[in-house]
Amino acid sequence: MGRDTIADIITSIRNADMDKKGTVRIASTNITETIVKILLREGFIENVRKHRENDQFFLVSTLRHRRNRKGPYRTILKRISRPGLRIYSNYQRIPRILGGMGIVILSTSRGIMTDREARLEGIGGEILCYIW
């Protein structure tokens, strides 16, 4: 795990998805917990539980699977703003992913939220990642 916890989440989920694993283990921080709750609420993952191991907390999340096929859904996650190049947007210029089918996760002054929530509240922020 590196210093960019958001990139670590995205990489862990993407690698587990490509490797057809059912669960992902992610180091638990406030940012990772909030992003995983958004993914759970939006239906990209099925289940999340907090696991403690040697005085460290981990989030164990179950990836969403198709009903008739054994493999997980192909979830595409893309990191946008990174430590070397921050990308900011006001609420009017937040991009729509696949015409509203995907989501944009933003870090705003009121916390981490999706693009729909930011548009409703009329606030912009740092674009963390795209998910579709």
Swiss-Prot record:
Q: What is this protein called?
A: Small ribosomal subunit protein uS8c
* UniProt GO BP: translation
Annotated Gene3D superfamilies: 3.30.1370.30, 3.30.1490.10
Q: Please name the source species.
A: Nandina domestica (Heavenly bamboo)
Q: Which N-terminal residues, if any, form the signal peptide? A: none
Q: Which residues form a coiled coil?
A: none
What this protein is reported to do is described as: One of the primary rRNA binding proteins, it binds directly to 16S rRNA central domain where it helps coordinate assembly of the platform of the 30S subunit.
User: What are the alphabetically sorted keywords of the record?
Assistant: Chloroplast, Plastid, Ribonucleoprotein, Ribosomal protein, RNA-binding, rRNA-binding
Family note: Belongs to the universal ribosomal protein uS8 family.
How does this chain assemble?
Part of the 30S ribosomal subunit.
Q: What is its main location?
A: plastid
Q: Name one GO molecular function term.
A: rRNA binding
| Compartment(s) where it occurs, according to its Swiss-Prot or TrEMBL record | Plastid, Chloroplast
Q: Name one Pfam family in it.
A: Ribosomal_S8
Name the domain of life. Eukaryota
Q: Name one GO cellular component term.
A: chloroplast
